[in-house]
Amino acid sequence: MAGYDLILRGGRVIDPAQSIDGVNDVAFTGGKVAAVGRDLKPSAGTEVRNVTGYIVTPGLIDLHTHVYWGGTSLGIDADEFCRNSGVTTSIDTGSAGPGNFAGFRKHVIERSEARILAYLHVSFAGIYAFSKTIMYGESQSMHLMAPRDAVAVAEANRDVIVGIKVRVGLHASGDQGTAPLNVALQVADEVGMPLMCHIDHPPPSYEAVLDMLRPGDVLTHAFRPFPNAPCTAQGTIKPAVLEARKRGVLFDIGHGAGSFSFKTTRAMLANGFMPDTISSDIHTLCIDGPAFDQVTTLSKFLCMGVPLPEVIKQTTVNAAMALRRPELGSLKPGNVGDATILSIEEGSHDYVDVMGEHMTGDKRIIAEGTVLGGKFFHARTPERFAPSKPRARA
């Protein structure tokens, strides 16, 4: 039997998909996970990295990002984001539509070292006017809805397109209500893919959007502030939210610049309502705050009392299941060889939501390193996790 290419030695491995939480080694061969266990034996050519005292998880998946760098005003660099945030799979959510997806694929997705998958926007040019100087919702004009083109592009790019995206709300769709969502759902039905729906201020209402979503569809910005919050001012979860969860609608955080509230989150968690996935909605207008990155978004939930394994679950296996990509999100042997190395820094840390409310947390998740496709990709400190190779046996 051939030896391992890489072993991460002695970290606390947290893999919620396999109910693993303990000190283990993780081995990779041929770009895939090869084994998880104690004292895995290297061969002469195995690269060994000592991660004792650190946390090793499946490669983090950020279900809501904008990484069409250079092609849209809101796009950030996916590889830089991966290095800083420990994210090995970025899901771009509608930056590109059928009219410009070919450029996104050729110039960004195929050139990126980090993995990029995408929700295709039903609007022809995706999210094209989103900056500090100009803001125009792409769903405000139904003339820009391109259902036939979207079907054709989604069918031709099934290897990287995981679903259909639409944005509705006062800022994104003006007075169009749920009309853009209706078109997007028709596209999603036609290609047999899930849909992700953005929601902002009404119209339409939170309830009206939820009523249209199907099992497996994702409502992003799910813990947004008033108006269109999922709970009342008294902290009661709206009945439509509970009904949607029962039928299988997924609730994603999508922090961003305007879509995550501590007040809402406290109410939802107090009622035992966890999001299905935690994502950053990282883009040019929130990368310098209040979202910053995926690990900062995860840290907020950790500091609000969500146990670390549950936080990891929502950015690994839960995200993979939302994508219908079971080869991601777990360190199960045979899965894609991605892993993230994390640490927890104790102390006093300031966090802020989109309403300007500050919260002092007692810990912070730090991305220390990543493994991409079975190869060590990045360490926050160059000398940390320096590789070693065992001597060949005589």
Would you name each region that the model predicts?
Residues V166-D288:
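Active-site core of metal-dependent hydrolases
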Residues G11, V26, G31, G53, ...:
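Divalent metal-coordination and catalytic microenvironments
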Residues M1-T57:
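Histidine-rich, glycine-flanked metal-binding segment
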Residues G71-E80, H143-A154, P203-V209:
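Short, acidic/polar
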Residues S85-I91, S95-A96, R111-S141, K165-V168:
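Metal-cofactor-binding active-site regions of metalloenzymes
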Residues N50-R111:
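Metal-associated gating/positioning segment near the N- to mid-region
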Residues K263-I344:
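His/Asp/Glu-enriched, well-ordered alpha-helical/loop segment
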Residues G11, V336-P390:
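C-terminal cap of metal-dependent C-N hydrolases
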